[in-house]
Amino acid sequence: MYKPKNQKRSVLKFKRFSNHGYSLFAVLGKEVLIGVLSVATLQNATAKGISVKTEKAETDSTFANRGVLMQEVNVTGTRAPLTVSQQARMVTVLSREDIQAAPVQSVNDLLKYAVGVDVRQKGPIGALTDVSIRGGNSEQITILLNGINICDAQTGHNSFDFPVDISEIERIEVLEGPAARVYGTSSLLGAINIVTRTPQKTSLSAHVEGGSYGYLSAGVRGNIASKDHWNNQLSASYTRSDGYLRNKAGSLNADYHTAKAFYQGNYTDENMAVRWHAGMSLKDFGSNTFYSAKYDDQFEHTFKTFTAIQAENLRGRFHIRPSIYWNRNMDRFELFRGAANKYPFNYHRTDIYGVNLNAYFDWNLGRTAFAAELRNEDLVSGNLGEPLSRPKHIHGTDRDYTVGLNRTNIQFVLEHNIILDRFTLSAGLTAVKNSQADMPMHVYPGVDASYRIGDAWKLYASYNSSLRMPSFTELFYSVGGHKADKHLRPEELSAFEAGVKYDNKGVTAKASLYWNNHKNLIDWISDGTLDTNGAVLWKSVNFGKIKHFGTEASLDFDLYQLLPSQKFFKKFGVAYSYIHQKKVDNQGYVSKYALEYLKNKFVSNLQLNLWRNLDLGFYYRFQHRMGNYIDTNNQLQRYKSYGVVDSRMSWKASTWTAYIEANNLFGAHYVDYGNVPQPGAWVVAGVSLNL
């Protein structure tokens, strides 16, 4: 039976650890079974993240390339963490080394290699990207920055506008499946947590890179770590591109400019830890035909700010972790770029305030956890919402915000964990009430279990449920060929999952099955009807009930461990996912999201060490998407399957790294989203410095 443990800072020692700069992220990442993803370890996840933090030993590049097997590595936590052998639900973790090895310029590009993630890109370098999990859409997942929810209640399209450059990310964690008792509303199909770097020594780093289509990116980061428990870090970056498309008039309509700045600090002593951050993201980009195929000169400007503070006690039997945050999102959409006289610009401002309190304690029957969260979402807009009693001025214009909406979400969680020698069980309930929803407080249960067979095999199974409130866009957007329904009901999901994992001596294999049952699923649909301006009319609706059956499998080889006598082959991996959607009588409707899912996805990668510190990696992905889209001639088109090859070559020295990357190496023609063709071959070269 689970026994109470002293709440001192504890250290777990893994006896065997391969010091490689890459791990299993589906094919690119590392599959980590995280201790039943309990409230005690996950609710209001901190910058330590979903996974157990690994303190990486310092090694030079020679040792790294030889794949030295270190005999003991400390894994330190601020609570008594569950060991690897006790863990149950799957979380995919991409480390900093994995990020550096991949041929990508944005987090969105990186997630394309996660087999369970669907990345539908509408522009270069993540200008506008919809990221979803297991056949869902961008509205159905929660995005977190250092454990703080940064989802945009206006629309999921802008959820990846966070204030840190990809070079400043320590790791990315992907949780697949409903997570109501972990992250609350919006985590209908999972969550993605982005954890930033916190170097323990004073340091300075910078990078610059350039490439195809006028691409340029540069950034700098400075960190001051004092000996009296304080750590402060400041970073900034700028990225631009001319884009790869032109409108009918020959002007740029996929260009991109973004600036980011981020400050984070922390204080830690023997009794407590406090962390805080503040950041901003400014982005201007040509929106091409992103929102309507009829108009090819759309433009969007977004400005976001993020502030948060978190704390936790490090001693005592009763463990408490509170946090408070405020995110502001400002958005200006131009149906005709720079021509407000043709159609007035759409202005929106969303302020999101949140307070979380998570607590747990250990006793003779296990670990009991409870949590509470209050989240307020306030929108003022020019065209989204109900009429305001007192209009608010739009800064820098002669117009006012005349409509808006305010809603509050309250969540309570109760959970208990039982840990035996080979068996782990976690069960809990989440109670949710939203001021906008015309329904009483709803309760969503969840249970996770795992059974360990020896040291290498593990069986696991889970049942979880969750819900999602409609976004403000789904409720009120009626512009440019769209007609929203303000009476949309929340969508709900219940899901079963079962799987097996094998991990031993350089070989990792995983297979899983899942069943997702959607109720009142929200989507935009069209029957081909045109609006008064001749654009295809899309309506937001509760689509009804849809069932998904899916399977995922991956096989990864650490070739340094399997073939220690050679140095050329570093790693090889393959992964595959399959989704079957129960046939729905769509009565001739075309769906924007619900029926446009990835039925088949295959990813693989091979990493080589050519000579000394010269590495070369190849990455391949194949995607087969279901569904149709209406082209610019109002004709119905089916999505075509495609395969893309990417590559990266790098030379890593002690204080600098030089690299060249090629995306879509063979120039495949494809679309992730109807009427928005993706770029052909894209080449980037750069250098980074670390002092």
Question: For each predicted feature, which ranges?
Answer:
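Gram-negative outer-membrane beta-barrel transporters
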Residues: 419-424, 515-517, 539-627, 688
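Short acidic/polar hinge/loop motifs at secondary-structure boundaries
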Residues: 149-176
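Flexible loop and strand-edge segments within Gram-negative outer membrane beta-barrel domains
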Residues: 53, 241-248, 252-258, 272-320, ...
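Short strand-turn segments of transmembrane beta-barrel domains in outer membranes
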Residues: 191, 196-225, 236, 251-255
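N-terminal periplasmic "start-of-domain" segments of outer-membrane beta-barrel proteins
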Residues: 69-100, 130
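Outer-membrane beta-barrel signature, preferentially recognizing the C-terminal barrel domain
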Residues: 292-314, 348-350, 405, 438, ...
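A beta-strand signature from Gram-negative outer-membrane beta-barrel systems
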Residues: 166-203, 557-558, 563
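Extracytoplasmic beta-strand/coil segments of soluble accessory domains associated
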Residues: 108, 112-148, 152
